[in-house]
Amino acid sequence: MMSVSLRMATVDDIESLFEIRTSVAQNHLSRKQMDELGITPQVLRSAINEGPCIWLAEVDRQPVAFSMIDRAEGEVFAMFVRPEHEKCGLGRLLMDAAEAELFKTHERIVLVTDGRPEIRANGFYQRLGWTVVERIDARDVRYEKRRPLL
């Protein structure tokens, strides 16, 4: 029986976050590509130090998935699961945590991702109640989700 836990990431987890991010097959980015996009260890360190914004899922104490929010923008900025840990409920757990935090201060939250049909994450987000509201470019789409009524 595997033991699953969810916790806030600390600066000590930065290397693990990059390892998880570069492990994915779909929407893959190398360290060099992330660097070119401004996604660097320094940027993650600043984000973590500004306030809790990254949830880390661990299986048997090993970091295997994470979600990250941009609180000011009301955006789920990232959600990645190591391929060998997909379809175990970790993505849903991480999205629930990110959404709950964003819904504290936003009525409507967003995420941007590769919207091509072959990208499996689209079906995942749609099953969680996210709706495509805009095509941003040839690849990316913007999803939106509204705070549930009580």
Q: Across the structure, where does each feature detected by a protein language model lie?
A:
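Conserved N-terminal entry element of GNAT/NAT acetyltransferase domains
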Residues: 1-12, 148-150
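Acetyl-CoA-dependent GNAT
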Residues: 11-14, 18-84, 95-97, 101, ...
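Conserved hydrophobic beta-strand within the GNAT/NAT acetyltransferase core sheet
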Residues: 76-79, 109-113
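Active-site acidic-Proline motif in GNAT/NAT acetyltransferases
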Residues: 82-88, 117
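Conserved acetyl-CoA-binding loop-helix of GNAT-fold acetyltransferases
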Residues: 87-100, 123-127
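Conserved beta-strand-loop-alpha-helix junction that forms the acyl-donor binding cleft
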Residues: 110-122, 138-140
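Conserved acetyl-CoA-binding loop of GNAT-fold acetyltransferases
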Residues: 125-135
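Terminal substrate-recognition subdomain of acyl/acetyltransferases
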Residues: 138-150
